[in-house]
Amino acid sequence: MAGGKKTNQGMKLGRTKPGEFDALVALAAGTGMFKKLEIEVLGELLRDWHASLATEGHLCRTLREADGTPVGFVYHAPAVMTKGTWHLYWLVVDKNAQGRGLGRRMVRHAEADARKLGAHHLLAETSGTARYAPTRAFYDKVGYSVEARVRDFYAPGDDQVIYRKDLRR
């Protein structure tokens, strides 16, 4: 550790391995940002991805410490029945590793993946509640803009905020 703060040296982003699923679910749960149902759905999604969704263009990348320990992951995929629209479904960074540019790194990788596969824009959605203000600030900071807001989408008083980034620029 340099100056008491962990560095990002030696971290590698690569294809998610089936043996990492439990660790990734634990990372997401450990952030304190996701509801119990969302965590359960994530576990199912990762198993489905490994079983079949990877053949449909869904991509899951894990960011690992030099020793191989997962510190984050990004899950992104083409939107069904569209040409060039992709979704950034999951972006998770270990609670203790946030603020070190790791989320930005994974988003940039997801953008590059999608661009290579013909995407012209990438969408990300989040909640409009105060609790998710840091998430919305993150998307603003990495160049996404609000494309739409669906009032009361998740629950009364909990809007869905959809962010978009044009990948052609």
Regions found by a protein language model. Name each.
Residues 114-127:
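Conserved GNAT acetyl-CoA-binding A-motif
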Residues 15-96, 107-109, 113, 117, ...:
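Acetyl-CoA-dependent GNAT
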Residues 125-128, 140-161:
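Conserved catalytic-core motifs of GNAT/GCN5-like acyltransferases
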Residues 1-19, 169:
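Conserved N-terminal entry element of GNAT/NAT acetyltransferase domains
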Residues 135:
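Helix-turn-helix
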